[in-house]
């Protein structure tokens, strides 16, 4: 082969060498039984048509490229946000390998999580013995202060009872009776990763507070509880902390994985780092109130907080963009009695200045976007504030109430009149939409790059560039440290959007003596 020790080539140029071209051609001709290229081209072109879109949208029992993940993924992220807590998945090793690699690739960090290795025998006879041995081994080997248990499809299909299994493990001495093992049933065949986060948080809150409410007094600790929900931008944890600190507000961030998912390379491995303490969780009912940063996917959490903690959860939206950050800060000020400081007022003014500076480039630009319910709703709201036009809005794990709420936001703005909201649809549906009604850009996670590739394959004039905002981001580095919440997050989103537009304009206008009449130095 053409790889030389003294001149190592990366995979992309290497596979362009003639040796590899010949090898791949022989593989195709000898083993792949490939269809004729003209037939492949014909089918590709057909999949870009309105006729195919109509057939595509009639799918009922098939998902192609889902824009969501399964419940235990969210449960693992929630558990990682608590101090010295080991996420424990009652299921097979393969599932946990998937969760860990998913987070590894997004955060570029080692992610600790264990399973109790259920196999065929456990699927038939139940996984109680796996649970007993697994809890014992986990505690002895990794020495956590808490083990947070969730489930996979296998355990849910056969009906394993986590409460009974954990109690039996304690009764038989596999783990001490006082050792905290909160749990949540997280069946992958309903809901999504955001549902799993909600279920796990409710399970942890229930474990630490349900039976100890007698001495709790709402407001006695003078703090505000902040529940982030399924959040994968580490900068968002930091910006919320910063804004509350600048206001002088006492707070408890309930599930805070910021440190464990961003540990330094200083020669010391940290299996555990930072996180919400058990004492903070036990004290949470004494707070002035509880604010949910992503209320659309925290339904069980809200029900528990209102029903058990007796907190009147304020009706807020995710603090993205200008208006909803205003509402968040004003509500925090109202609850805490602390004024909004001049530093945040100045920060708001800078955002408004940036919006004014860039509005001529953003105005009227058409976007397709997808992601989780709260994120998509917040992004739609901010796009409208910028004068952009969201046209294809897809949320695979959204529900009818969410769609109705987004439709109302769109109806309140002149820039939302051409938008359509899709729930329960996947990225193959979105692919059809961007072919038949082309937007200027897509906003979403890394999986959108294949849609961009397909649109480019049809022709340069059909290409829809991807702007990477969302989860997961596998093919770019360090974006997970960015911010999307607060005024700071709005500034970062605005900067990303307008510079993507200008980069695209430069790309289209750098043709020498052809299009470079608009290849301007100043934009």
Swiss-Prot record:
SUPFAM superfamilies: Helical backbone' metal receptor. InterPro entries: ChlB/BchB/BchZ, Nase/OxRdtase_comp1, Nase_comp1_CS, Nase_Mo-Fe_CF_bsu, Nase_Mo-Fe_CF_bsu_N. It comes from the Bacteria. Nitrogenase holoenzyme is subject to 'conformational protection' by FeSII; under oxidizing conditions FeSII binds to the holoenzyme and reversibly protects it from oxidation. Binds 1 [8Fe-7S] cluster per heterodimer. [8Fe-7S] cluster binds at residues 70, 95, 153, 188. It catalyses: N2 + 8 reduced [2Fe-2S]-[ferredoxin] + 16 ATP + 16 H2O = H2 + 8 oxidized [2Fe-2S]-[ferredoxin] + 2 NH4(+) + 16 ADP + 16 phosphate + 6 H(+). One of its GO terms (molecular function) is metal ion binding. This molybdenum-iron protein is part of the nitrogenase complex that catalyzes the key enzymatic reactions in nitrogen fixation. Belongs to the NifD/NifK/NifE/NifN family. This is Nitrogenase molybdenum-iron protein beta chain. It comes from Azotobacter vinelandii. The gene is nifK.
